[in-house]
Amino acid sequence: VTNKNPGTTDPDFYDYLILGSGAGGCAAAHRLAQTGRRVLLLERGKELPRDGPTTAVDPVLRRRDFHSTEPFHFSATAARNDEFENLGGKTKWYGASLLRFTAEEFLADESHQCPPWPCTAAEFQHSYGEAERLLGVRHFPVERDLRTLLDRLHRTDPAWQEEPQPLGLLPEIGNDDEVRRFDGFTLISDHKADAENRLLAPIRHLPNVTILTETTVKDLLPEAGDSIRLGGVRCADGRIFRASSILLGAGAMHSCRLLARYVQRHELAAALPAPELIGRYFKYHIGSLILAISPRAYSDRLRKTISLLHPEFPHSIVQSSAWIDGELIGARLPAWLPRFAIDALGRHAYAFLLMTEDGSHRDNRVTELPDGGIALAYDHELVRPAIQEHQRLRENFSRTLLRAGYFPLRKRIARYSTSHASGTLVATANPQGSVVDSYGRVLGLKNLRVVDASVFPRIGRGNPALTVFAWALRVAEDLAGETVNSGLVTHLNSA
């Protein structure tokens, strides 16, 4: 690929080319669009329909109409692919829980197998604030049933600490039936802040912004005569797009495979400080769901308002989860079970999500199947501290609920679930042990950056979505400044 001058009128040349429209891709596009330079965002999936199926249990949970069909193997065995392919990425389906990492979660914790970030919490504050502003993050009041449950919980074990759960929801959602189907579903309205409606919608009308869906990128391409500098991308349909800067935002399961292909094809291992780490250090959350069953039916509607912390479990969090009912519970149970019993269970169930930060191990990794699908090699035995803490968390919270008068029903989240995947293009405080630096630059290459959770050396104990938004804004801000400075130098030299 031979790139022309950035001032070219070539319709297939862009200043910034972003791969993926999840939290990172959309945040980067939002910031870079403000430069006035040409931005192209490519998304392999479609724009989701707004006529109802994304809020219905059958198409979403039973038929899995919106999940990726790409082959996926977990520990060498074919497994269900939990990835989504759509404009807005996983943020269209998330529960809008938008927590900041604590200052400690940016630091190393060797006992939990956690390396440090390449930047501090203080360096993230501006980006966190900007992300929260764009997403309209707010707290919601605790409803009556949950207040009763929490009071009983505190009386049983005062060590449980309560914090409001920051949410990207509009207040109107509390007065709408959508409150029952916002977590794990995509809303027809914009009551839930996601990457598309908060970050793409305000810029998609701009003349310098192009968004293409159903466009699968197969290969990164080099600049002619210089494979250290990328020139563009080749898509599955043969189209080629060129750009001055390329940003990977395809997610931790995909961005690493694109980079691995490029480095291998162009024999660039010697140019990168740690090419062997591409795809390694995969991590996610060790998770469980516990239903607190009460003799009395619950009437709370929003429910997802509180986080619980305990000093005995410093890498873990318990969050009150969104509405649950018989239809949701039944989607995961055999069809022969009587519906009236499942509906009764749903009326008496309050859901809690338990998450523990995963540790890092180089042998937990993502590679490519021979047919182009995803291969995830992951062994819980390699991250024993995380597994052990989560087991103790489950036992403690279940026991506390039981003593408080609630019967706990427990379900472990599937090991092959990749909803919070991260770490496969790791950035740490040690450049020689990193693929990416503190501003998303792929070390050893000239114009490739990463704006998704692939870079995370730690995932924290809560949902990492806000940190992905903030990271991408930080990277895009730096890239925009770099572009401005480069343009100024060029102007002065030609004057």
Which residue stretches match the model-derived regions?
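Extreme N-terminal leader/targeting segments of oxidoreductases
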Residues: 1-16, 34-35, 481-495
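N-terminal Rossmann-like FAD-binding beta1-loop-alpha1 element of flavoenzymes
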Residues: 16-41
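A glycine-rich dinucleotide-binding beta-alpha-beta segment and adjacent secondary-structure elements
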Residues: 178-183, 188, 213, 218-221, ...
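Glycine-rich loop(s) and the adjacent beta-strand/alpha-helix scaffold that form part
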Residues: 34, 45-50, 54-55, 215, ...
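Redox-cofactor-proximal catalytic regions of oxidoreductases
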Residues: 61-142, 353-362, 367
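Conserved redox-cofactor binding core of oxidoreductases
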Residues: 110-113, 117-217, 414-417, 421-424
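FAD cofactor-binding and catalytic pocket of flavoenzymes
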Residues: 81, 275-382, 421, 433, ...
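Glycine-rich Rossmann-fold phosphate-binding loop(s) that bind the pyrophosphate
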Residues: 20-22, 44, 250, 453
